[in-house]
Amino acid sequence: LYDCDVIATASQGKLEKCVELGADFAVDHRKEDWHKEGKKTATEISKQKSKESEIDVIYEHIGGSHWNKELSLLKYGKTIVTTGATTGYDVMTDLRHIFFKGLNIVGSTQGTRAELESGLHWMARGKMRSVVDSVFSLEEASTAHQKMLSGKDLFGKILMKP
């Protein structure tokens, strides 16, 4: 979209889908050393483009289990945007990772109206799209909720329609 190189993280079964959706590379975040593979990939990209190896922004929604590894990937002045905490809200952070590197930590939820309009602009031009996993009627709300809780074979949003 903005000439970014995108390294997505996902479970093994979702890696191919991430690339199909436009990620340049995908790394299995369930591997113990996923962050090292992500850093190695960023270094390979930078060599191809003759630029300094950096990860400029991390969009973080997993929380506790990945937080410190993600912070370790960022260089001075870079940004982590946290949008959720799937694996837990409480983290122990070595503050030196933040102040010595001058990191920016940004919290985000639903976004502003202007951001929604920007997203719709890109969607209308085919540059972005929503990924819908499944659609349920209101009568199937319990089934939809169970699917969401299980997380099995889930890739994208679950929609409810009247």
Task: Please give the residue ranges for each predicted region.
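Adenosine-nucleotide cofactor-binding segment
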Residues: 1-66
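Residues in the short beta-alpha loop(s) of Rossmann-like NAD(P)-binding domains
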Residues: 12-13, 86, 111
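Terminal peptide-recognition signature
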Residues: 18, 58, 70, 105, ...
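A general structural signal for well-ordered alpha-helical segments in protein cores
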Residues: 35, 55, 67, 95, ...
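Short glycine-rich, flexible loops that bind phosphorylated cofactors or substrates
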Residues: 65-67, 88-89
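Conserved helix-to-beta-strand junction in the class I
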Residues: 72-74
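Rossmann-fold dehydrogenase core element
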Residues: 76-83, 92-134
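C-terminal hydrophobic helical "lid"/dimerization subdomain
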Residues: 113-162
